[in-house]
Amino acid sequence: MRIITGDFKGRRLEMPENNNIRPTTEKVKEAIFSIIVGNREDAVCVDLFAGTGNLGLEALSRGAEKCYFADNSRESLDLIKRNIAMCKADEWSTVIPGDFEKVLTRLGERGEKIDIFFLDPPYKKGLYERCFELIREFDLLAEEGIIIAEHNVRDKLAEDLSGFEIIKERSYGTVAISIYG
């Protein structure tokens, strides 16, 4: 897995040793960033359920101002930190340990406004809905912000989640991307 373009182009990210961490494939990552290209420079991002930090680091490479990387797995957190260091992206990166509810609560308490959320939770029922509820509850999404949810193509997400509506949907094999705003 590598950074596709931008300041960190070509850098190979360290991969997980176990199969519990499921990084976004390069094909899907390329598709995500081709969809959101444009006014996303200087964005503040959250890579929730970050795993390897793949999506957040790609966003930073393409000009995002800051990225919060969040995960509750010790292995993932260590991997994210190593990948951030390898890309020399420490200045623009904040790693937040903990489950997604605590992380979103903490960001809400800080009054953060997020331009891009990357959501790639374990494919379990209810996690997407709860993420959207908390993003709404803490008013975390910036005015022109988007939420990018990666999910199994068989698990159709609702057209409207906590008042956020689907803007675009795409599928790539067994993976689907739903973008909300």
Regions found by a protein language model. Give the residues of each.
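Class I S-adenosyl-L-methionine-dependent methyltransferase catalytic core
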Residues: 1-181
